[in-house]
Amino acid sequence: MAEVITGRQTATVDDDVVVFLIGMRINRLRRVHTEAVIQDIDIPIARAAEFLAFLHADVGVLPIWICPIRAPAPGTDATLYPLPRGTLSINFGFWDTVRSREPRERGFVNRKIERKTTALGGVKSLYSDSYFGEDEFWSIYDRGAYEALKARYDPGRTLGDLYTKCVLRQ
């Protein structure tokens, strides 16, 4: 619960949930489809302008965080996050809700971003919603390296695999 300096109680988490649910209901009644787009995408610097143009033209999210990053040096063990070693990339971070009057399948905009990222040789952080097919996911995130770590640190398979957690959200 939040309190102001006087100690008087203000909005609670329950109030926030009610406002959110009312907003969703209003959108449904108005036939507005919404999709949360929360992503961190790393694109090689040579293709960064193309990705930014795509975000503006095809996605329309604002604001966009733009930050240069350098991948680990060649020979460094970091195969689960597949940026080309020693290269400079641009990280694009964006958090917004995209609205449309056209009915869309779940994850439509996020999937469009994933396809563009892959086409430009980029990689996406997996903390956000992901919609990759399983074969595509493992072609990007090195199943062999992941399985080697899994065999060593979770040989009994107590915890789910990366695809199940990140894409299927189980």
Please describe what each predicted stretch is:
Residues M1-V109:
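C-terminal substrate-recognition/cap domain of FAD-linked oxidoreductases
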